[in-house]
């Protein structure tokens, strides 16, 4: 009863500080539960607790952003602290989406550390004055703030999670070339084959991009190529996990790329209204273009060249670093029109 009374007496700033710490604790707990579930797969409860932790983290971060929105009077995307928490919220939301697609604990093993790291950086590494809500600078007092920044951060979240799953694919396959079930679009042609692992069929669902590419096509489907033997040293269970990681990575990148495109276009329109030019080759703009080109090359290679497995995973791994440079790295320069809210 005393605890409830104490919580009821907190103001919005105190609620934000509390939710800040709770979000980190819940993310850390979810990560540890997922890792425990991977180490002891017979204990199903561990993975279920990891899922509960990621749901809790998503709701806690949403509550934190809502409290900050009410307290500050604007949507909380004006500085690095706020954008990091929104990015973490996007990562946890996409984790839940990917888990819905795959039903695989290994998605959580991969994505929970990413969410935990982002929240830890925001909650523990940033100075206290950076975590306080500040009045919007004139350039950010626009309705375009929510449109441009939210879409860009959701794009970053999708691309980061998708790229991280591609890195996990390379680890699982030990960097070897493997023959995956189905084609690079995530479709199975010809008669369906019995699954060799409980999670195999979930990994072969068509990606959003594949559904668009093959919509309306009525030509006969080619027969599925004969199965290839597993590379030496890679068990069949690892190959089924690799299939899950490859297809889920592709689907998330296929989701993040159009969001990135929309975000860049919205930013260009906003820039023209604020500064009188659509494009000024600001460092952030330049790296956003580089990010777009990297993932455009990834999707082009998969859709038109039929790439799958190792080669697109390497390209996505490059994209993982490029996204971080675009989001955080260019802020180290302290220059340009996008240098708001850095702590140097």
UniProtKB/Swiss-Prot annotation:
GO process annotations (BP): cytochrome complex assembly
Pfam families in UniProt: Cytochrom_C_asm (PF01578)
Regions crossing the membrane: 21-41, 45-65, 80-100, 106-126, 151-171, 252-272, 287-307, 313-333
Compartments in which it is found: Cellular thylakoid membrane
PANTHER family: CYTOCHROME B_B6 PROTEIN-RELATED, HEME EXPORTER PROTEIN C
Protein name: Cytochrome c biogenesis protein CcsA
Domain of life: Bacteria
Species whose genome carries this gene: Synechococcus sp. (strain JA-3-3Ab)
Coiled-coil features, chain-numbered ranges: none
Family in the record: Belongs to the CcmF/CycK/Ccl1/NrfE/CcsA family.
Membrane topology of the entry: Multi-pass membrane protein
Disulphide bonds in the chain: none
Keywords: Cytochrome c-type biogenesis, Membrane, Thylakoid, Transmembrane, Transmembrane helix
NCBIfam families on file: cytochr_II_ccsB
Function per UniProt: Required during biogenesis of c-type cytochromes (cytochrome c6 and cytochrome f) at the step of heme attachment.
Gene Ontology CC terms, in alphabetical order: plasma membrane-derived thylakoid membrane
Position of the signal peptide: none
GO molecular function, one term: heme binding
Record note on quaternary structure: May interact with ccs1.
HAMAP family registered for this protein in UniProt: CytC_CcsA
């Amino acid at each position: 009863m005393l605890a409830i009374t104490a919580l009821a007496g907190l103001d919005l700033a105190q609620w934000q500080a509390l939710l800040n710490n709770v979000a980190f604790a819940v993310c850390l707990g979810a990560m540890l539960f997922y890792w425990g579930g991977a180490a002891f797969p017979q204990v199903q409860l561990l993975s279920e607790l990891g899922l509960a932790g990621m749901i809790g983290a998503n709701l806690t971060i949403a509550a934190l952003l809502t409290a900050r929105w009410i307290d500050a009077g604007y949507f909380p995307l004006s500085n690095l602290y706020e954008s990091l928490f929104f990015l973490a919220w996007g990562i946890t939301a996409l984790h839940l989406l990917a888990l819905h697609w795959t039903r695989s604990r290994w998605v959580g093993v991969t994505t929970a550390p990413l969410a935990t790291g982002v929240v830890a950086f925001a909650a523990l590494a940033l100075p206290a004055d950076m975590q306080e809500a500040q009045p919007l600078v004139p350039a950010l007092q626009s309705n375009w703030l929510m449109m441009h920044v939210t879409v860009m951060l959701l794009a970053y979240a999708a691309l980061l999670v998708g790229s991280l799953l591609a890195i996990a694919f390379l680890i699982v396959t030990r960097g070897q070339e493997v023959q995956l079930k189905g084609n690079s679009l995530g479709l199975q042609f010809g008669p369906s084959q019995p699954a060799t692992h409980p999670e195999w069929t979930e990994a072969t669902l068509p990606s959003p991009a594949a559904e668009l590419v093959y919509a309306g096509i009525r030509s006969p489907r080619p027969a599925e190529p004969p199965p290839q033997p597993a590379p030496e040293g890679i068990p069949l269970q690892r190959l089924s996990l690799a299939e899950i990681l490859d297809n889920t990575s592709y689907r998330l990148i296929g989701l993040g790329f159009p969001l990135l495109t929309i975000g860049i276009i919205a930013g260009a329109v906003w820039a023209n209204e604020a500064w009188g030019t659509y494009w000024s080759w600001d460092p952030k703009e330049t790296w956003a273009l580089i990010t777009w080109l990297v993932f455009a090359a990834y999707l082009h290679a998969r859709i038109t060249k039929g790439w799958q497995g190792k080669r697109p995973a390497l390209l996505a791994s490059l994209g993982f670093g490029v996204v971080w440079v675009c989001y955080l790295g260019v802020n180290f320069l302290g220059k340009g029109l996008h240098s708001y809210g850095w702590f140097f």
